[in-house]
């Protein structure tokens, strides 16, 4: 998981000279401000809209939009899995030809990017279809076993409008595959980020603290302790990061001096912020205090990351600044409002988990039974 804010060319004092030995003109202050301002804005969009869509996703019953719930066990294992993946990629790039690895990764992310972008633009595109558009419903269903032992492996519902969105997304996919243009990269990166915030749900605040705390250590080690993360980020030709040129004002769309932000720095804090929005809604106070607090904390943390990176001219582990801000600010607000207990007792169940469904049914049965008893006593 790429989770660092850096400038691949200007990440250090020596980086003004590219690998071919030619001198790269230094970026102008205006170009730097435009690049990092754009990265900040691009990071906020999937968090904000992904959080809003996560609420509808949690309430929805569509099998194609079921969220994936992260438990405390998943959160504890995630930094280990991410470290193994990162180290594996680093070794692959050292041992095998970078050209062939990136070719395979490009094909893989070409397919994933089309699906993610199609899912992202579908709600917006629905507004442009005429009322008499011939929209047909489809279902892709794969099962294993038969009778009572039948188990659904894939159950995806879609319609003709989704197929149109898939076609439009394929155009972006071909553009990315052929040109590797930074705009196509960012379209896929934004789609991945929004889908991650929307569909990955933490089951409670404690799990979020475990996940962010573990990745806090992960980020510091792999950025400051080794050059592994920065090396992989530079070698990895896939839309796992948002990029924006610092020389856009001089070279236009053909600019090539990029600042970058890993998608991990968007999705990981984003799913925690989305959880706090759902917690806000569960309080039924018609306020989104914790969501706005954590959202402002993210802006502060990422802004501080960019500032520190610019001062020290070195890639920064963004989660070093984002994690304390995104956890600390909402907890301080909860302390001030006396809602710490409510915050840490808020729980979301996995809609795919039969045990959770059974427990929910039992709770509703018990609740209705207690109501009947109360009526009889009256």
Swiss-Prot record:
Q: Which residues carry this modification: Phosphoserine?
A: 368
An example of a GO molecular function for this protein is: aspartic endopeptidase activity, intramembrane cleaving
Protein family according to the UniProt entry: Belongs to the peptidase A22B family.
Q: Does the keyword Aminoacyl-tRNA synthetase apply?
A: no
Q: Which Pfam families match?
A: Peptidase_A22B (PF04258)
Which stretches does the entry tag as region Disordered? 1-27, 346-378
Q: How does it sit in the membrane?
A: Multi-pass membrane protein
Record's function text: Catalyzes intramembrane proteolysis of signal peptides that have been removed from precursors of secretory and membrane proteins, resulting in the release of the fragment from the ER membrane into the cytoplasm. Required to generate lymphocyte cell surface (HLA-E) epitopes derived from MHC class I signal peptides. Involved in the intramembrane cleavage of the integral membrane protein PSEN1. Cleaves the integral membrane protein XBP1 isoform 1 in a DERL1/RNF139-dependent manner. May play a role in graft rejection.
Q: Looking at the UniProt record for this protein, which Gene Ontology cellular component terms does it annotate, in alphabetical order?
A: cell surface; cytoplasmic side of endoplasmic reticulum membrane; Derlin-1 retrotranslocation complex; endoplasmic reticulum; endoplasmic reticulum membrane; lumenal side of endoplasmic reticulum membrane; plasma membrane; rough endoplasmic reticulum
Query: As annotated in Swiss-Prot or TrEMBL, what is the tissue specificity of this protein?
Result: Widely expressed with highest levels in liver and kidney. In the brain, expressed predominantly in hippocampus, amygdala, piriform cortex, choroid plexus and arcuate nucleus of the hypothalamic area. Isoform 1 is more strongly expressed than isoform 4 in most tissues except brain and skeletal muscle where isoform 4 is the dominant isoform and in testis where isoform 1 and isoform 4 are expressed at similar levels. In the brain, isoform 4 is not detected in the choroid plexus.
- UniProt-recorded name of the protein: Signal peptide peptidase
Q: Which residues are glycosylated?
A: 10, 20
Q: Does the keyword Ribonucleoprotein apply?
A: no
